[in-house]
């Protein structure tokens, strides 16, 4: 009878321990909605990583990338997230200053210059205005032309809630510096609306509610690959185009640090990177072969990018400057 009791106790302990390990082998990733959507890169990346890690990947998505850091700050050390994936270089110092992230100590072979030890890039792109060349026959060839023309209507994103919206703010600041407020005053006459995120604005553009929409130089690749149309084009401005580098980082509060580190290493793998050009419609950070559609894109050789510390120190003032110009 005593032996039977010991056997039953051992079975119960084994089942309890197995459940504990099963729960611990879940990797929770906070990201933005389009990354985790069924048409985004998330599902395929989840399947590929789960095959390798014998674990479960769970995406927790917010409406846009700019709100990711806010969500983590509100949750603090009680956050269920292991990894944050989706904000860009303009939030690096803000994120580091929360003291919620840990250095990843990962060596990656990137095709962009990167020196931050808390966050690793997973894709990059350049902002541009997208237009339909069957509707807009004479697109602007410079930011100056766009600012000064009176026959174009555009849709852009709010810099307080959207990373592309903030990107436009920094793009204009990079070109015009102290003259940015007067530029915004002129530009506002052309802006149909500011949307909270990219998805809303691009949808409105596709419904012909404006001549152009703020997006990326890579956006036409989507229409080439999935709609077999080349009528959507990206503007090419002589002043250059502002860059966006999207990153991922591990939280100190992660209950599965080794698994999180494994995923961070997985980011630079072919399995992860091959999903970026076709599903996230951005450039990969590794030298994989790009789809044919990307060979037809215009990518500016003049890449504009501000030091993250300068952005951190000035962002609030520049947003207030933008608000006052409305």
Language model feature labels by segment:
Residues 293-326:
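Extracellular/periplasmic bilobal clamshell ligand-binding domains
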Residues 90-94, 206-231:
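A ligand-binding cleft/hinge motif common to bilobed small-molecule-binding domains
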Residues 251-306:
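Mature extracytoplasmic/periplasmic domains
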């Amino acid at each position: 009878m005593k032996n039977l009791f010991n056997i039953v106790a051992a079975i119960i302990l084994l089942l309890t321990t197995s459940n504990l390990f099963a729960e611990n082998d879940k990797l929770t990733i906070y990201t933005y909605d389009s990354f985790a959507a069924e048409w985004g890169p998330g599902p395929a990346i989840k399947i590929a990583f789960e095959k390798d890690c014998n674990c479960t990947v769970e995406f927790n998505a917010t409406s846009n990338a700019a709100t990711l850091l806010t969500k983590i700050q509100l949750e603090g050390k009680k956050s269920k997230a292991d990894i944050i994936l989706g904000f860009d270089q303009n939030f690096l110092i803000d994120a580091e200053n929360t003291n919620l992230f840990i250095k990843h100590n990962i060596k990656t072979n990137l095709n962009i210059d990167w020196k931050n030890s808390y966050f690793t890039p997973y894709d990059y792109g350049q902002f541009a205005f997208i237009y339909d060349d069957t509707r807009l026959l004479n697109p602007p060839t410079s930011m100056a032309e766009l600012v000064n023309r009176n026959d174009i209507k555009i849709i852009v994103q709010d810099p307080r809630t959207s990373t592309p919206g903030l990107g436009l703010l920094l793009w204009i600041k990079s070109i015009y510096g102290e003259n940015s407020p007067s530029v915004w005053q002129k530009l506002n006459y052309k802006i149909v609306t500011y949307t909270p995120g990219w998805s809303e604005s691009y949808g409105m553009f596709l419904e012909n509610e404006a001549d152009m929409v703020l997006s990326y130089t890579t956006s036409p690749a989507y229409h080439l690959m999935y709609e077999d149309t080349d009528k959507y084009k990206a503007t090419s401005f002589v002043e250059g185009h502002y860059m966006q580098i999207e990153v991922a980082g591990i939280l100190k509060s992660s209950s599965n640090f080794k698994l999180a580190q494994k995923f961070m290493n997985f980011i630079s793998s072919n399995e992860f990177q091959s999903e970026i050009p076709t599903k996230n419609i951005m450039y990969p950070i590794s030298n994989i072969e790009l789809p044919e559609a990307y060979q037809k894109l215009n990518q500016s050789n003049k890449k504009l990018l501000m030091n993250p510390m300068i952005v951190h120190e000035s962002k609030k003032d520049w947003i207030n400057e933008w608000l006052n110009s409305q």
